[in-house]
């Protein structure tokens, strides 16, 4: 049996070696072949001869299924697979860009490039047009800005929530990236 840096028994998902307390087990050897139902002593001896661990894979089966393997390597591979899975999960964020009804062309283009970058990275984009003072009387200008943004980004995005009404002193639209 190899010496394995052992976590506390309560934290370990599988029982190994002498922790297995049954009379007989269904054994799978290190090559993945069925060795049949054997006594626990015989299974431990086979694991010791192979200089590996006896790991209880399925404790609820009758008799429990045990496998001869390197437990440290098994835990490492399991952890590595979990990390890889976590890495593949993308958390979608909502990025916000604020416009004003009188946003100049140069500023508009800079903000548009930022929106394109956000959408290409897979994030959602929240476009807000804020009105101050007398601008509230010309809400149509702000809605035209949102319409222009929507048209400029139509190829790479889809409108998730359109600016139907004002929320206080601002009009809001949310764009999501198109599925590839």
Curated annotation (Swiss-Prot):
**Briefly, what is this protein's role?**
IF-3 binds to the 30S ribosomal subunit and shifts the equilibrium between 70S ribosomes and their 50S and 30S subunits in favor of the free subunits, thus enhancing the availability of 30S subunits on which protein synthesis initiation begins.
Cite the HAMAP family for this sequence: IF_3
Q: Which Gene3D superfamilies match?
A: Translation initiation factor 3 (IF-3), C-terminal domain, Translation initiation factor 3 (IF-3), N-terminal domain
* GO molecular function, a single term: ribosome binding
* Main localisation: cytoplasm
Alphabetically sorted, this entry's keywords are: Cytoplasm, Initiation factor, Protein biosynthesis
Protein family according to the UniProt entry: Belongs to the IF-3 family.
Q: Does the keyword Protein biosynthesis apply?
A: yes
InterPro entries for the chain: T_IF-3_C_sf, T_IF-3_N_sf, Translation_initiation_fac3_CS, Translation_initiation_fac_3, Translation_initiation_fac_3_C, Translation_initiation_fac_3_N
Q: What is this protein called?
A: Translation initiation factor IF-3
Which cellular components does GO assign to this protein? cytosol; membrane
The major lineage groups are: Bacteria, Pseudomonadati, Pseudomonadota, Gammaproteobacteria, Pasteurellales
> Can you state the subunit structure given in the record?
Monomer.
Please list the GO biological process terms of this entry. Answer: ribosome disassembly
Subcellular location field: Cytoplasm
